[in-house]
Amino acid sequence: MDCEGTEDEGAGCNGWFFVEAIVEKKTGDNVSDDEDENADDTGSDLINFIDSETSICSQAEQETARALFQAQELQANKEAVHQLKRKFLVSPRSSPLGDITNQNNTHSHSQANESQVKRRLLDSYPDSGYGNTQVETVEATLQVDGQHGGSQNSVCSSGGGSVMDVETTESCANVELNSICEVLKSSNAKATLMAKFKELYGISYNELVRVFKSDKTCCIDWVCALFGVSPMVAENLKTLIKPFCMYYHIQCLSCDWGTIVLMLIRFSCAKNRTTIAKCLSTLVNIPQSQMFIEPPKLRSTPVALYFYRTGISNISNTYGETPEWITRQTQLQHSFEDSTFELSQMVQWAFDHEVLDDSEIAFHYAQLADIDSNAAAFLKSNCQAKYVKDCGTMARHYKRAQRKSLSMSAWIRYRCDRAKDGGNWREIAKFLRYQGVNFMSFIQMFKQFLKGTPKHNCIVIYGPPNTGKSLFAMSLMKFMQGSIISYVNSGSHFWLQPLEDAKIALLDDATYGCWTYIDQYLRNFLDGNPCSIDRKHRSLIQLVCPPLLITSNINPQEDANLMYLHTRVTVLKFLNTFPFDNNGNAVYTLNDENWKNFFSTTWSRLDLEEEEDKENGDPMPPFKCVPGENTRLL
């Protein structure tokens, strides 16, 4: 700011000024407002011009007035600049588009200094060295309120020059429109990428994939679409991705956005979307927002044909063995096999794998759809629930008939064949010796128990708590695949129904009420004579009670009220607490391997039937419920 009448630029309103009055009139000079141009200059006004008495006071008053004027000008300039900053720059307190009332008040307040503000604004930008440009662009960031209280940043460009204040309203209106467009573009980014993918590849991305809502769901096959990949990186991607996968199918097409890559990848192990996105982001150097990652439609024939046809063309690069879901749907013989479903094959599978529960049959058989054509046809059927129910019913019928057809010796041999080797029968012998049971006496007792000898087909394991009674009995039931009955269901007429199909049974933790019930109603069970039991929704059945093992904290042979059971049960006493080592592991291991070795070692002492000659055939031939095929001889 040029202060007229001073030597220097001035040091502010608090500094000293050296005032020098120069009156020189020349032709063409502007006449100040306080002079009368037409008045005659007689020189009379110079009389007593200098008053030596009041010169000091007059000078002080003039300096005070000038300092006050400069302070007012400085304050007005600061307010004008502040209003311009609030107009064109970001305000942390409020939005420039939000409060129009404040702008009107500010405009009326600074109307007197409008011309000076415009001139100073234009002169405030630094010169580039080549003079002031005709049009200068000022970029200011505006903060536009969103719909939900958020904010969206955009860039406003306004022209400089003498017409800057005229174009201010129009420029800010354009800024608001551009900000809304930016918001719309950001919210429709996925739709824009989808449209670009369909325009370039001629097929919708959603037609190739099935959507996983969770990013943590794992799958081994994934379809990935990458946008804006560098052409050089896209060319080298087939080499970079090879260590991570067993198969890939890569297509690369270029557009104005760069290269868009479509990949079908089978990884070495199942991965989730988050892991794959991080891996690809590292390999191709693009953000995860420019990726679509979803699993393919494994049961869609058009999808399989698309990858098959593009895989054999020259527009794609493939590596590894083609996934079976593509091969199954593109080869002719597989399509014929998938058209029919045979219930007998499903029943045979359930019987061979000993899967007898309906829910387990449905779950495990559905997992075979990728490798078994009959399972794939099962999934395509609309009668899956009916097939599962029928399969479970038939498999249980076959298993029940197989179990009834086997003797005790054949059943023990059958269970031994399904147990692993490497057991040690001495673990069982050591545990019996630890409980004070003579091993040879136990062998004699166990032999009559397995044969179902009348009045010797029930063994009671008696002892205080924590002596290993239930552990010993449950390990034997697991190996023999026996049935468990519980006295808690004694209120029902059908609580003894599991004994119908059992080779051996267990009644765990019999209380005094249970012994009273046995003494009143089940004496003939312990005698080994045929008896009748009730079955739910079926007629009564007559059977002989299988060998029954009972654990209890009560010794029935010492109770006078249970005198009729004294000769019907054989008691084993477990009086010592079951031992554990310092790590909490059982000292004596009672598992299937040890029981298998126990029966193999004591087979002859238990008087079990010797294994028949293999030349005469297997005593339990493999079961086959699938119809055979006639072989045509040449």
Curated annotation (Swiss-Prot):
Cysteine pairs bridged by disulfides in the record: none
Function: ATP-dependent DNA 3'-5' helicase required for initiation of viral DNA replication. It forms a complex with the viral E2 protein. The E1-E2 complex binds to the replication origin which contains binding sites for both proteins. During the initial step, a dimer of E1 interacts with a dimer of protein E2 leading to a complex that binds the viral origin of replication with high specificity. Then, a second dimer of E1 displaces the E2 dimer in an ATP-dependent manner to form the E1 tetramer.
UniProt record similarity statement: Belongs to the papillomaviridae E1 protein family.
Keywords: ATP-binding, DNA replication, DNA-binding, Early protein, Helicase, Host nucleus, Hydrolase, Isomerase, Nucleotide-binding, Phosphoprotein
Gene Ontology molecular function, alphabetical: ATP binding; ATP hydrolysis activity; DNA binding; DNA helicase activity
Short sequence motif Nuclear localization signal: positions: 85-87
Name listed for the protein in its UniProt record: Replication protein E1
Signal peptide: none
Biased composition (Polar residues): 100-115
Subunit description: Can form hexamers. Interacts with E2 protein; this interaction increases E1 DNA binding specificity. Interacts with host DNA polymerase subunit POLA2. Interacts with host single stranded DNA-binding protein RPA1. Interacts with host TOP1; this interaction stimulates the enzymatic activity of TOP1.
Top-level EC class: isomerase
Residues reported to bind ATP: 463-470
Keyword ATP-binding: yes
Location of the SF3 helicase domain: 437-587
InterPro entries, per the entry: Helicase_SF3_DNA-vir (IPR014015), P-loop_NTPase (IPR027417), PPV_DNA_helicase_E1_C (IPR001177), PPV_DNA_helicase_E1_N (IPR014000), PPV_E1_DBD (IPR046832), PPV_E1_DBD_sf (IPR046935), Rep_E1_papillomaV (IPR016393), Znf_lg_T-Ag_D1_dom_sf (IPR037102)
Region of interest called Disordered, as start-end residue ranges on this chain: 92-117
Pfam families, per database record: PPV_E1_C (PF00519), PPV_E1_DBD (PF20450), PPV_E1_N (PF00524)
UniProt PTM: Phosphorylated.
Biological process per Gene Ontology, one example term: DNA replication
Entry EC no(s): 5.6.2.4
